[in-house]
Amino acid sequence: MLVRNRYLGELLKNSRSFSVLNSSVRSGHNKWSTIKHGKAKNDAERNKINNKFANQIAMSVKLGNGITDPSMNIRLATSIELANKNNVSKKVIENAIRKASGSSASGKDSNASELCVYEGMGPGGVAIVVEALTDNKNRTIGLIRSAFNKANGSMTPTLFFFDKKGYVTMVPPKMLDTEDKVLESVLEIQGIEDIAPVQEDAEDLECDTETETTGQTYEAVMEPADTNKVAALLKERGFHIRDLGIGYNAKPDMEVFVQGDETLEKLQKLTTALEDIDEVTSLYTNASNA
């Protein structure tokens, strides 16, 4: 996006050097250029969204032991629901499922994607773990290494900074309108190690306006092997499952407080560059806000 904006800026700057005699024609041309570049930008954003959701769907199939039936794979069902809410087309969803199962639209076998984990150290000594779903590991690791190098970071083991945990993000039914009621309702669910309210974006909260829920989002943490079981039990109790998966939580004694605006800006630039890689599905750091 930044490259495109700089390119458009150069076009606009150069247009001011043209003869004033051609101003009326140039005005129409510039309007068309603006519309054209605006459409290209929107198309690029849409493609980025489609790619991210397609990877999440494919990963849901992979982590669900290859089960492609949403009724039997709760993570896949949740991923498809999120994709639909973000206007991802049926074709994109179906292709993502085929990609994960190793077959193409024609029914022939294709190169199945693999789940890969990459480790690195970023600005300020921040440990980073990157998850990606890729059908070309050499290409993906090249892109990730390039992002680290440009930020003066390095690819080095960092998994020991984190605990691997399962998580379920959900919204309680309306009758559970306080945190105490929520905690009491999940006491009998075995496997939950911790549960707490989390802050969600306004756009995400709007997605639940049609459901009989409180609007407050909670996240439960458990061992990875218990994730699907816990999600199914929460759903039985009326919780709306927003997301679930397996991720990496920074160990409390391994968290790093990022000092200085310049370092923070460099770290943000690196994480953005990593997230912009199509194959990247998740990114975790041990940076602390405290």
UniProtKB/Swiss-Prot annotation:
The keyword Amino-acid biosynthesis does not apply. It is found in: Mitochondrion. It comes from the Eukaryota. GO terms for biological process: mitochondrial translation. Gene3D superfamilies: 1.10.10.200, 3.30.70.980. GO terms for cellular component: matrix side of mitochondrial inner membrane; mitochondrion. Keywords: Mitochondrion. The keyword Zinc-finger does not apply. Coiled coil: none annotated. InterPro entries: Integrase-like_N, TACO1_YebC-like_2nd/3rd_dom, TACO1_YebC_N, Transcrip_reg_TACO1-like, Transcrip_reg_TACO1-like_dom3, YebC-like. It holds the Pfam family Transcrip_reg. PANTHER family: TRANSLATIONAL ACTIVATOR OF CYTOCHROME C OXIDASE 1. Present with 1780 molecules/cell in log phase SD medium. HAMAP family: Transcrip_reg_TACO1. Belongs to the TACO1 family. This is Probable transcriptional regulatory protein HAH1. It comes from Saccharomyces cerevisiae (strain ATCC 204508 / S288c) (Baker's yeast). The lineage of its organism: Eukaryota, Fungi, Dikarya, Ascomycota, Saccharomycotina.
